[in-house]
Structure formats: C-alpha cells, structure tokens
Amino acid sequence: MRDLTCGFIGLGLIGGSIAKALKNQQPEVNIIAFDIDKEALLLAQTEKITSTCYEQLDDVAAKHLGSCDILFLCAPVSRNDDNLRLIKKHLSENCILTDVGSVKTPIHKTIDELGLNESFIGGHPMSGSEKIGFANANALLFENAFYFLTPTKQVSQDKIELMKEVIGIIGAIPLILDCQKHDYITAAISHLPHVIAYSLVNLVNDNDKDGMMKLIAAGGFKDITRIASSSPVMWQQICLTNTDNITELLDKYIDELSSMRDALKAQDGDTLIDSFQSAKEFRDSFMNASGSPVTKLHEVYLYIPDKPGALAMTATILALNNISIKNIGIMHNREFQKGVLRIEFYDEPSAEAAITLLGQNNYTIYHR
C-alpha cells in the first residue's frame, strides 16, 4: 500500500485506537490530528503517533486535514455537522471522508445536503470500551472485530477498496452495508441491548432496599449489564439519533416479554421451554457463524491465593512477557464458572500463550 496521510478530527478512544493501530502496522503512515484535549495531543506526540496536531479547527487546520488521503471524523456525533461545514471547502477531491458513529442515516443525510457524496464512506467499528479518551486507546481494540462501511452510491470503487484495505490493516473485518439496514441491525444488536441493560440495572436498584441484590450481583447479572457502565451521554445521543428503529424493536421486545409473563402466570411450561430452547440454539450458533473468533470471548479463569499482591503478581507475569490483558477481575459469585480470577485477552493466541505461561508458574487454569 502506498504511503498514506490520515487525518483525525477527534483523538479519543476510537480515533486514538485507529491511529495507534495504523501506526503500529504501517509506521510510515503520516497522522495529523485535531482535538480540544491538549493532554491527548501531547500524549499522541509523545508516543510518536502523530506528526502534526491542532488544538483549534481553524482554516489552517482544516486545510491540512482536508488534504489527507483519509479523514476520520471521530469527534462526538453532535459536532459532525459543524466540523463538516468547516472542512468542506478545504476537502481534496481525492480525500476519503469517513466517520465512526454507530448511527449512519443522519450523517448520510448531512453529506448529501453538503454535496460530499463522492468523498464519503460511512464507518462504524463494532468494538469499544466503557473507558474513554486517548489514554485508554489501544492498537488491538479492533482485532477481529467487524467494521461496517456504508459508502454512498456516488463514491468510487477505488476509494471503497482503499478503505477496506485500511480497515484490514488495523485488524478489523470490513463489511459493506446500506446505511438504513445498518441502523436497523445495530438497533437490534447494540442499541436496544444498552436500553435493556440500563433499565435492568435501574429495576434492581429501585427494588434493592437493603442492598442485598447489589452485594451478590455477579456472574450472569454482571455479564448482561456490563454495557450499562458505558457513557450515559454517548448513549443518550445514539438513542436520540436512531429513535425510530429502537422504538420499533422495543415494541417487539415488550410483546416478547408480555408473552413470557403470560406463560409464567399460566404455568405454561411448554411455552417456556420452547422459548428458552429456541433462544439457546440461536445464541449457541453465534460462535460458529463466521468460522472466525470475532464473537468468541478469549477468557481464562484461574485460582489465586487470597493474599496481598496476588492479582498484581499475575498481571506482572503476563506483562513481562508482552501479553496484553483486555479485562481482569475477581469473580465473587462463581456458580456457573470455574476459577476465582477472570482474565480476558484480545485474541486467542494471547489466551493460549497466557495458559502456557501461567501453567509454568503453577497456576490452576480453566480456559473458556
């Protein structure tokens, strides 16, 4: 691939992770960035990720960013319209304009209104974190993750192919999709689940007068409500920009819950088992749908002694051998899971390397 210059309007978790992944895989890539967070820009320069940074999106910055081969819009979605209007007059005809928002139809409408259809390929990496900011950016964030691309009908095939190549470089799997279909799919598998997770946590909170539910909440409850720790502001914006799709699916979900309630009241075991079995079969098929580790969690469970420094020692053993940890935590309720310490890795090779290494250090390990 030819040497590229990539621009970023916004260098937070997603923008920063894309920039880091590009720089790690293609050190010759030139990266230019704008962000209002001075510390993020300083950190990016210290880590030698960026060559040029701007704290203001003035004409000088807009002209430089508009001349890039690819310009990533990674600022908050609410800023996209203003940023696009600032960039428009400086945008090179060869520049690919892309975003990372999880709702695509609104920005496609703005692109159409501004006459930028020949430049725009919508983007949505299906990967993220509850954490925010460049300080939490990770070059492995998109490893084996789906990355939706929603090109306009007017953008050239050459630009689409280049964008697919870049997505592959950062370790993700590009999927081409119509923007409206994308928004319905993500409403079902991402946006509605967040609404449900927030609602379920609020339900428990409202009914937990003595704090006992909170005390024992772990395992399954934490797994299905983990996403309720995501940014409330970000999810407010997402829900308000994909309202029609979310409410349509929410109505269907309410109907599903009503059917379950009716079956419970009627002690209708057949309906319950049919529903549970159908859901289990569909859920169990997720891991094998693509023959890829995309949907698989790379988890290791192990026992550690209950003494000061035990967890830190485990993490240090892995870090000294360049094995990155995606998530780590003590399992206080392990009714359906073996091991007291749960470690999640970014990919299967890392998990396998950790199993070998920790086994050599006499840990009792369970791999999931």
Segment roles from a protein language model:
Residues F282-R368:
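A conserved regulatory-domain signal marking ACT and ACT-like small-molecule sensing domains
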Residues D58-L91, C95-I96:
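Rossmann-like NAD(P)-binding element
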Residues M1-Q56, A61-L65:
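NAD(P)+-binding Rossmann beta1-loop-alpha1 motif at the extreme N-terminus of oxidoreductases
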Residues N83-F134:
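Rossmann-like NAD(P)(H) cofactor-binding subdomain of soluble oxidoreductases
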